[in-house]
A protein has these predicted regions:
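Catalytic-core helical/loop segments in enzymes performing group transfer/polymerization on anionic/lipid-linked
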Residues: 1-480
């Protein structure tokens, strides 16, 4: 093989897809950059942010410190807006996402008084030496590990035929690179924990690499960790393994701050300690209110997609992908037939299938939006159609919009509450036309869906419009 070619082989998770909104008409551009370039750009922005947020570089010595991990300040806007009124100090540590990336996020953090911790703010010559020594020690262990050639040849084999030699060098390079990255992350987090005395820590998932590090160090220091529910979850017995794999259940966290009664009851049914579970609502819905004036502009159908994922093996089959594409095609055809405008809002995941090529073949006027807040789109639509089980269902119910759930993806996770409490009209592709016609032209059916949706949102979401206050109130009580 050509060694120059081998050097350019991509390593998993070594590149990042970035979606960027262009202009004011929701046009978006997607491009990929290497992980190394992303880290360099993130480092530059963090150094600039430190200068621009000089007033945020001090904390009140008499107040308790709360560490928040990988939070999006725009999504949690009401939470950040309430921080100045609290008697707590908030510090944010984002290693995968930038804390600041536009004027809105900068303004929110500046006004919140939240202290941003970065690699730059934690690094010094002593830490660099510790990391370097750790890598040297681990490199020797890696060499010893991979010297056991017979084990790897046997492990990576099928019916006695080993395929270890075909990817040996690639695997070793990948393993070493990731190990060195984790050594750095562990030491940075240790430095952060020594630098500040934290009374509690907020995380959004238990499975992220930095969250795993935080959970272990927090347990050693006996610092309570709160897992904050950040999206709608399957609440079925069949989905337990999937939910654990996604890190959305409090397996290791000390507290679970769930949205409402539905999440609370599901957690109890999964034998999670009731003392861990706290129904406090969610700051991400605080600014979501029904606007009757704008709601009268109902001039479109909104299709919300949550397509096949790389994490679920069944989603990778040709059959499932074709079924998903056929569902989008059918929606585009029917909405065009009824002379309604159609907007497609995709899931924000970088790996989400872009349906633009499908939509434009049917109707060039169909808009596909990949970035931005979905609430204004829901507010101005006459009807929302969802493919998959996704959080905008709750948004639509709060905003009093009828929802059709189009079954296009097969899984073994059971049927969640929102898809069996009559708050959504459930249909397959064959029944979509009749159901779409019913909701668009039958006010009784439409209003019944809206009323059932309101009831469902009250079960899913407690303390509506007051989630941030409840979250901060819980933290103040926890650490006092």
């Amino acid at each position: 093989k050509n060694s120059n070619t081998e050097n350019f082989q991509p390593i998993p998770l070594d590149s990042i897809k970035i979606k960027m909104k262009i202009g004011t008409k929701n046009h978006s551009l997607e491009f990929g950059i290497s992980n190394n370039l992303f880290k360099k750009l993130k480092g530059i922005s963090e150094k600039s942010s430190k200068f621009l947020l000089s007033k945020n570089n001090s904390i009140r010595e008499t107040s308790k410190n709360i560490l928040i991990i990988e939070f999006n300040p725009i999504k949690y806007q009401s939470f950040f807006e309430r921080m100045p009124d609290s008697n707590l100090n908030f510090l944010m540590y984002n290693r995968r996402r930038p804390a600041i990336w536009n004027l809105q996020s900068y303004d929110l953090i500046k006004k919140s008084g939240c202290l941003i911790q970065t690699k730059n703010s934690l690094s010094d010559s002593n830490l660099s030496k510790i990391i370097s020594n750790g890598k040297s020690q681990f490199e020797a262990k890696i060499s010893d590990l991979f010297s056991k050639e017979s084990f790897f040849e046997s492990f990576f084999s099928i019916e006695g035929i080993s395929f270890w030699p075909t990817f040996k060098e690639y695997f070793q390079e990948y393993f070493k690179k990731r190990a060195f990255e984790f050594i750095e992350e562990v030491e940075l987090t240790k430095k952060l924990m020594k630098k500040y005395d934290f009374s509690s820590i907020l995380i959004l998932s238990e499975v992220g690499p930095n969250e795993r590090i935080i959970l272990q160090l927090a347990q050693e220091e006996q610092i309570p960790v709160c897992l904050v529910q950040h999206g709608i979850n399957y609440d079925t017995k069949e989905s337990y393994g999937m939910n654990v794999a996604k890190g959305v259940l409090p397996i290791e966290s000390d507290h679970f701050l769930c949205w409402g009664k539905t999440g609370e009851e599901f957690s109890r049914s999964m034998s999670i300690n009731p003392e861990k579970i706290h129904s406090i609502g969610s700051p991400i819905f605080d600014r979501l209110t029904f606007d009757e004036q704008n709601s009268l502009k109902n001039d479109c159908v909104l299709l919300v997609t949550s397509g096949p994922t790389k994490e679920h093996a069944l989603d990778l089959t040709i059959e499932i992908i074709e079924k998903y594409m056929n569902a989008i095609t059918k929606v585009c055809q029917l909405v065009t037939k009824y002379n309604k405008k159609l907007i497609i809002k995709t899931h924000p995941s970088p790996d989400e299938l872009d349906p633009s090529f499908i939509a434009k073949q049917i109707n060039s006027q169909i808009k596909v939006i990949k970035e931005g807040n979905i609430s204004p789109l829901i507010q101005s639509c006459d009807l929302m159609i969802v493919i998959g089980f996704t959080s905008p269902i709750v948004d639509a119910h709060v905003l009093k919009k009828p929802v059709i759930s189009l079954t296009a993806l097969d899984n073994d996770w059971g049927i969640p509450t929102a898809l069996k409490n009559e708050s959504c009209l459930i249909t397959d592709i064959d029944g979509l036309e009749d159901n779409l016609n019913s909701v668009l032209n039958n006010e009784h059916i439409k209003n019944e869906l809206i009323q059932n949706g309101i009831k469902s949102s009250n079960e899913y979401l407690s303390h509506q419009s007051n989630g941030a206050a409840k979250l901060i109130g819980f933290l103040e009580e926890l650490v006092k």
